[in-house]
Amino acid sequence: MPERTQAPVTLDIHQILSILPHRYPLVMVDRVTEITANKCIRGYKCVAYNEPWFQGHFPQRPIMPGVLILESLTQLGGILAYASDPFDATSNLMFFLGIDKAKFRHTVTPGDRLDLYAEVLHHRSNVWKLRGEASVDGTLCAEGEMLASIVDREP
């Protein structure tokens, strides 16, 4: 990955894939629209009907699983951590450690653009505590506080 002195304001899918270890079908952030290092990040996920989880959740009324909405927020938080304190994405991973205060308030369905927001609550060493919100058309769908840690890729 090329060296940089400042994180870009926006990231496309290719830049996201250079940071996140996730690949299809679990890349849950399509674009980052705003980054303020050590503070907050905004992005989105376009929710398509052909996502594999809609085959079983639920065929007659497809709804994005809440755990995947939280995964979207956690991935966005990982991108924020990288933009704030760059780590070697080829030898480190950001592991999700826990969630607090998770609430699911509205369904997310195929065709929705899931708008994502995360902010740093606390950061010390390799541990990050973040708060995230996911919304569709301005309606809050899910929120929670996530705890994550940067670890070596190889145990």
Curated annotation (Swiss-Prot):
Query: Which of UniProt's keywords are assigned here?
Result: Cytoplasm, Lipid A biosynthesis, Lipid biosynthesis, Lipid metabolism, Lyase
**Residues the record marks as active site:** H57
User: Which family is this sequence assigned to?
Assistant: Belongs to the thioester dehydratase family. FabZ subfamily.
Describe the function of this protein: Involved in unsaturated fatty acids biosynthesis. Catalyzes the dehydration of short chain beta-hydroxyacyl-ACPs and long chain saturated and unsaturated beta-hydroxyacyl-ACPs.
Q: Tell me which PANTHER family the record gives.
A: 3-HYDROXYACYL-[ACYL-CARRIER-PROTEIN] DEHYDRATASE
Tell me the NCBIfam families matching this sequence: fabZ (TIGR01750), PRK00006.1 (NF000582)
Q: What is this protein called?
A: 3-hydroxyacyl-[acyl-carrier-protein] dehydratase FabZ
Q: Taxonomic lineage per UniProt?
A: Bacteria, Pseudomonadati, Myxococcota, Polyangia, Polyangiales
